[in-house]
Amino acid sequence: ETESFTYNTIYKNGFKIIFLPITEILNRPNSKEFINYVAPVKEKRNQFINFCKNLKQKEKCDLFILSVHANDTEYTRDVTENQEKWYMQLLDCGIDIIWANHAHIIKDRKIVIDKNGAQKIIMYANGNTISGQRTNPNFTEKNVDLERDNTGDGLLYLVELKKSPNKIQ
């Protein structure tokens, strides 16, 4: 079975941008036919990687952005080894920016230099832009169980890109 995913093509400031949103979790299993769902299992992830490789080759875009509603534990700042491996595979298949979220709190982010010298970005989780999850926060104690108190924090990014032959900086 070949999966198909919907995506947007955006033309902005001389860039051709592919924006592809996916989710790895479903609140209702019967809704997967209406959204870009990638089950967090090896077979489905490999199919998705092949889809992305083919899409990048077909569209010849300057920038490929993937938005991931990640199969990730909420309220934890840890980036798992499996998550790191998965995101590196996605960068290797041609994605330039991974914009992941699910934890509801801020996680780390990093810039990766690929084999051609291009800079790629992974944002593991940017918190909540708007949140109603925080009630009676307690910031005075160092307690892992209180990470939910950090759900009121969120990041917005300004990323400046420059086109060079064969890469984006």
Language model region names:
Residues 133-169:
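A short C-terminal boundary segment appended to hydrolase-like catalytic domains
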Residues 22-25, 71, 127-129, 164:
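Solvent-exposed coil/turn segments that connect beta secondary-structure elements
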Residues 20, 65, 102, 124, ...:
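Divalent metal-coordination and catalytic microenvironments
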Residues 61-94:
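Active-site-proximal segments of metal-dependent phosphoesterases and phosphodiesterases across multiple
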Residues 87-88, 95-134, 148:
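Glycine-rich, Lys/Arg-enriched anion-binding loops that position phosphate/diphosphate groups
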Residues 2-3, 10-14, 57-59, 114-118:
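Extracellular/periplasmic catalytic domains that process cell-envelope and extracellular macromolecules
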Residues 12-64, 83-85:
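Binuclear metal-dependent hydrolase catalytic cores centered on His/Asp/Glu-rich metal-binding motifs
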Residues 1-7, 26-29, 71-76, 98-112, ...:
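Active-site environment of divalent metal-dependent phosphoester hydrolases
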